[in-house]
């Protein structure tokens, strides 16, 4: 989706081949966009010229800002979407985009000539020639669904799997392994007793993902609901573990599942002392009565699913419309990719999304956008585009998977980012719009609007640093009245704003010329509160930038580097990274290895 839009909007004739045109941009698991770190990726996609944020704003039915009681670095939006409307609007955008052509087609082979992509071939034998191919296979590569001991091949429930592609790429040297993920059952709304659950309404504050849209307050017609499992639920699960493809006597699933989205079986087995687990009951859209049971992913048999669901308060008479299931699929080793998401093995082949071992719509969309941008830049003969870890969560994610690899489905987390205070929800457009404009995906008027915003923020901060106030009785009485300590010596408004308990709004009584722009005020408040921490982080990024500037020649022979450990030699020969900063993040690489490499590179030059 994002990949195809990027290449087409950058002027290249693009064919989007998909096995089901009615499920373009479909949400096969939770009907939601965003969440911790994920919501920030959606904002970053928007700042770079992608579409996800805009369509989320158009189709969201319940939205909340998460972690509002915590620091600014972990705040993020999460929205329930109308999944049918989301898919339809995305499909319509694709249909209306110049240079972009949709085709209902199932690709089964990729042809390579002299180490470069030549074409793809579908199941009808039709060959599509191309100088750049972006593969976004999701869970479709040799996908297999498990519901108890019942198994069948599928890309997701209701869709055929992709057969032949894995084998096609393996013969060129691309390595594949298996992962597993799962999704909970869907329940008919009229069979749910919501009076036994805790209601969670949409935000009372106006919110939106895209900078192009105006924040809105949604109607309260589509709340989410909170309920809990109990000992009866857990006893049914324990009693039936022998029927689980994960825990049965015959383990049918070999692929590793996601750590941060475990099945209910995993929770019960791994946390036996916990007597309840929360379940969020989420609406799937405006035109359906189906609800998603967030937190109740399982691969147990249908009969067991129904029995355990009916032990949960509010779900005693639940009617399952679609069973929960686990799905196992192939993914490619992401260490065989450059940071541009182009394959190191096959020139012109780009991989994005779950095929790279990641999980989640947002992670996939972010990768798709980067892959699409780089495919277009490659065809233009221009420098490739990458984001580093201090610029975006997208950069953190890509750097993680291509340097460290994955041994479980990768999910973006705020804890993965060393510079998360720089990578906030509120400043995504200030961070990245210039890049989006330079690439050609952000319009000039929008970029100029961002420049104006930056100028206003800078001017106002400078003004606040110059406006001095004295410790008069009147001023100290006011400060005491708003529960902050009085002044002992003259200070600036900016210094007062640095206090954690003071807002810009409260300073109006002391300020001769306050401003009214909420956008500017938000940035000023955050700058004041976190100025010292931000300055420290910016200093740390300089150290990282110095390591990044030490590039590694493609022809380097790691076997010739004195004092480089055997472990480092083996890993670096396999991954073939481009600079010392990337090398420093590889698990098992020691400071001594880094020093040996830097010393050798100096003599090499």
UniProtKB/Swiss-Prot annotation:
InterPro entries: FAD/NAD-bd_sf, GIDA_C_N, MnmG, MnmG-rel, MnmG-rel_CS, MnmG_C, MnmG_C_subdom, MnmG_C_subdom_sf. GO terms for biological process: tRNA methylation; tRNA wobble uridine modification. The keyword tRNA processing applies. NAD-binding protein involved in the addition of a carboxymethylaminomethyl (cmnm) group at the wobble position (U34) of certain tRNAs, forming tRNA-cmnm(5)s(2)U34. The keyword Flavoprotein applies. It holds the Pfam family GIDA. NAD(+) binds at residues 257-271. Its main location: cytoplasm. The lineage of its organism: Bacteria, Thermotogati, Thermotogota, Thermotogae, Thermotogales. FAD binds at residues 107, 162, 354. It comes from the Bacteria. GO terms for cellular component: cytosol. The gene is mnmG. Homodimer. Heterotetramer of two MnmE and two MnmG subunits. This is tRNA uridine 5-carboxymethylaminomethyl modification enzyme MnmG.
